[in-house]
Amino acid sequence: MQTWQQRVDKALGHYLPDEKTTPVELHQAMRYSVLDGGKRVRPFLVYAAGEAMQADATALDVTACAVELIHAYSLIHDDLPAMDDDDLRRGKPTCHRAFSEATAILAGDALQALTFHLLAYHLPDSIPAEQRLSMLDMLAVASGSRGMAGGQAIDLASVGQQLSLAELENMHIHKTGALIRASVKMGAMCRPGVDADLLQKLDHYAKCIGLAFQIQDDILDEIADTETLGKTQGADRALNKPTYPALLGLEDAKEMAMELYTDAIQSLTDFDQRADPLRWLAQYIVERGN
């Protein structure tokens, strides 16, 4: 994991615009929001899925950067006053607090654009063109109205509402789960001619851990402190957002996360020890903060 952290951080530093180039403040905001912070869970999932499939190393670096840039863009916009209005992210002032609201909006836009530039021009030719196009489409869908953006829209519309479990799951399958599923599948697709059956099993794994990730996030928002979280503790409760602990109770939410973890692990039965990083990441997702 440490090697993967070093690889993705080095690649991100390379692909992000130099903060001394014009427009300086925009480039500073982009680098500020991406570098020196974050758990890098999505890039790690790219690398872990690639490891399980013996994928191309260069393609994995590019793809790991792409999913982290999309994630960073989404966090910048989620933190804006018009959305979650948060002051802290990764233990430091949010982008719009460190710079300005206008610069934060532009930084998010620019990170999203850079994502698709990387996938369009920096994936190696060893990956078939059709497969590269499929990866582009996959990330576009995962980040748009049928993915993250759609999930955030549902989230904003659900403030103060009582959602059913099915409605809450649907929201987070889009808001959180879509990018996690794309990260795993795109990592696997960094192998030329990826096996469709194995890809389907990885997608099921990713769907399970995507929901488990959000449940654990909701749990930590209730029980962890601001310093541990790196963002404002209790923010979801303060905004009267629907969460798994609020709907199910804390203990039942923990049990649901563990059931999803077990389901995720079972979906990896046909994979050998090269899938152990995926198994470890699933465990990390449900145990982090404990």
Residue ranges and their predicted role:
Residues 1:
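Double-stranded RNA-binding/processing signature
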Residues 4-7, 16, 20-267, 276-286:
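Mg2+-dependent prenyl diphosphate-binding active-site environment of isoprenoid biosynthetic enzymes
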Residues 273, 287-290:
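Generic C-terminal helix-cap and adjacent flexible tail
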